[in-house]
Amino acid sequence: MEVTKPHACLREVVVTIPRGEVDRYMKDAYDELVPEAQVPGFRAGRAPRKLVEKQFKDRIEDRVKGSLLMDSLAKVTEDAEFSAIGEPDFDYESIELPEKGEFKYQFSIEVRPEFETPDWKKLELKKPVETISEEDVDAALQRVLSRYASLEASDAPAEIGDRLLITGKFVDGEKTISEMDEERVTLANRLSLSDAVCENFGELMKDCKEGDVVTGKVKLGEGHANEEMQGKEVDATFTVVEVLKEQLPELTSEFLDELGEFETEDELREFVRASLERQANFRTEQAMRGSIIEKLLASADFELPPTLVRRQMKRELDRKVLEFRRSGFDDDMIRRFVNASKQNMQQGTESSLREHFILEQIADEEKIDAEPQEYETEIQLIAEQSDSSPRRVRARLEKTGQMDALRNQIVERKVIELISEAATVTEEPVEKEAEEKNEEFAIDHEVLPTKDHDAIPAAKYDDNTPKGAETEDKQEKDKD
């Protein structure tokens, strides 16, 4: 085996298999086939070996080629002095099994970068600590009630906070690049799309009425997959199908029971407070993680190939969405995060990959891994936040290939905890930045669709939403 290193995260491997090994595989394959071979003019298994070899030559050679590749790749993985993070890249059809001589083939494979582990012990860290106020609970409770508000079509001009049913058309020059079907949005100051932002959406749409057609601009993200269009403004036309005014429900005993069998408003407020505390803990963990990573990255410099970064984008976003879900953030918050991340994906993914490689290397050295019970705990927590069953959550994660992302999430959190325990930590009370009501609303629509656009699993559930108060969409799915 010959290994060359064209890049810090890439290896080119040439594998050479001796002729004797090829002949042994061929002999074993024919030994297995001859007793069962069906050749015209002979009973099954009675045809001469030479005739069997002639008739089944192509099939056996292809089978042997596959077996040799699988077995040799397994041995390469076992013996190699690198840690693979991807599958071997080669063209199976172009590899030929020679009639004589050695069997050689070549492949490339992405590997973990090699670097010296930063000194992570005895760091000095500041831990921001939030306090949840009654005003915070009031605001969160209003957001919960807003999701169960009755909506009535209105001829009155739209105001910030109203709901709009709109369609959209996006044009670059003379070319229509996408059209948006009917979307129900909250009229906010800014509209976030999957790959673009309309910064003055509130100003554009305020005072609009049913049937109005409003034109403006949206700006594509600086990290858009189409490099020529990064940061470019395109024309947007929004058509108002309907203006809807909301009427919040009253906290009657019947409504409290419908929400989640709460007996009093105080019980509901405690539920909402617990959700806010989980979100505050998440922000604290993220701030601590950011401080730790900043210190570790300062002494660990390594290159990342652009192809690796592009391939890891969706995987990294999946991992972060899982973190948001388990921490109780609602659907709109997650959608805003997803849109912002997509718009600046390249830079964010590079930073996250560096974090991952450093934390993974520390995990290897400290023998840290995810235990079966930890998977169950995470799945149980996600299930509780989404008012779903652990079995259904696990099935969804397995179906969408996110179990590996869950494993990374568990391992990286354990490493951060290890580093924090070894650090000198000073707590600092902080005030949560006030989130202006109706500042931004996010929708899942790509203004400029790309060929490689993997859908991010929608976060359909909201931790602030008490059990029993599922959306109609989820109730219908549960009936299936």
Swiss-Prot record:
Swiss-Prot/TrEMBL keywords: Cell cycle, Cell division, Chaperone, Cytoplasm, Isomerase, Rotamase
Cross-referenced SUPFAM superfamilies: FKBP-like (SSF54534), Triger factor/SurA peptide-binding domain-like (SSF109998), Trigger factor ribosome-binding domain (SSF102735)
Reaction catalysed by this enzyme: [protein]-peptidylproline (omega=180) = [protein]-peptidylproline (omega=0)
Ranges of Basic and acidic residues composition bias in the record: 429-480
Cellular compartment(s): Cytoplasm
Job description of the protein: Involved in protein export. Acts as a chaperone by maintaining the newly synthesized protein in an open conformation. Functions as a peptidyl-prolyl cis-trans isomerase.
Domain comment (free text): Consists of 3 domains; the N-terminus binds the ribosome, the middle domain has PPIase activity, while the C-terminus has intrinsic chaperone activity on its own.
Family: Belongs to the FKBP-type PPIase family. Tig subfamily.
Name of the featured protein: Trigger factor
Organism of origin: Rhodopirellula baltica (strain DSM 10527 / NCIMB 13988 / SH1)
